Amino acid sequence: MSNAREIRSKVQSVKNTQKITGAMELVAASKMRGAIVKMNNVRPYVESANTIIKNVTAASIDYPNPYLFDRDVKRVGYIVISTDRGLCGGLNINLFKHVLKEIKNNIEDRVGVDVCVIGSKAENFFAKLKDVNIVATAHYNDKDKEGSIRAIGGAVKVMLDKFTAGEIDRLYMSSNQFVSTIKQRPRLQTLLPIQDIFSAEEIKANKEKATKGHWDYIYERDIEEVLNALFIRYIEAQVRGAILENAACEQAARMMAMKNATDNASDIIDQLKLDYNKVRQAMITQELAEICSGAAAV
């Protein structure tokens, strides 16, 4: 058993660490509230983009746009959104396990995989995989929002260009979904082809509504130009919304991780204090025994 001085040193060390984790918990809680506000602010825009896309797709259901229709799958693309920093529990690793399962299924089916990674954690993880080709990387930085948006837009454009050129036949996005402060779960959603976001019933209903003239759009300039721009904006809106939601997940996960660390530090301190008291009791007992032995000898 350690001596009393060593135990006191350990207690002080754990207390110092506890102060740091407690402060990080408060900072993460503050940042989480701001991230949730941003996430909620962008949701109406993303939902409106979804509605517009559904209506326009229904009105132009037979228009030969490469973003719309299925084709034989020989290669797929993934946009994986992670964090740039750690200390957020299992948030990133759970996401990577989820998307890696899908990637392995594709590889087993002899389907090639291209990945666009957003966040340094995803970049470091997928760089170690031999069968995965990283074609674009980007990072989101609150201190340089405009630069981050341009970088992310450029990375997304790489994937869109590859889809348009026929180099990939499906495009998916993997990110974390904010369920609550204490629960976040990985999510994989289809971005392209756009028809894949509709069920068979929705496609049938959209065709019927388009035939009956529910949506009758007049396009200025060329319909191809308008639809291409609209579809690109739609994909960008989906990605930006997912990035903001992932940021809220990151801060919530970090807050809970730091709270657990702070609570665990309290348990460790209690155990160390118990050990310290045992050591002191043993020392006192030994001293008393020595005094009694000396008195008996006299």
From Swiss-Prot:
GO BP: any one term: proton motive force-driven plasma membrane ATP synthesis
Disulfide pattern: none
Keyword ATP-binding: no
First-listed, main subcellular location of the protein, grouped into a coarse class: membrane
GO cellular component terms, semicolon-separated: plasma membrane; proton-transporting ATP synthase complex
Subcellular location: Cell inner membrane
Entry-linked PANTHER family: ATP SYNTHASE GAMMA CHAIN, ATP SYNTHASE SUBUNIT GAMMA, MITOCHONDRIAL
Physiological role: Produces ATP from ADP in the presence of a proton gradient across the membrane. The gamma chain is believed to be important in regulating ATPase activity and the flow of protons through the CF(0) complex.
Subunit structure: F-type ATPases have 2 components, CF(1) - the catalytic core - and CF(0) - the membrane proton channel. CF(1) has five subunits: alpha(3), beta(3), gamma(1), delta(1), epsilon(1). CF(0) has three main subunits: a, b and c.
The name this protein goes by in its record: ATP synthase gamma chain
Species per Swiss-Prot/TrEMBL record: Francisella tularensis subsp. tularensis (strain SCHU S4 / Schu 4)
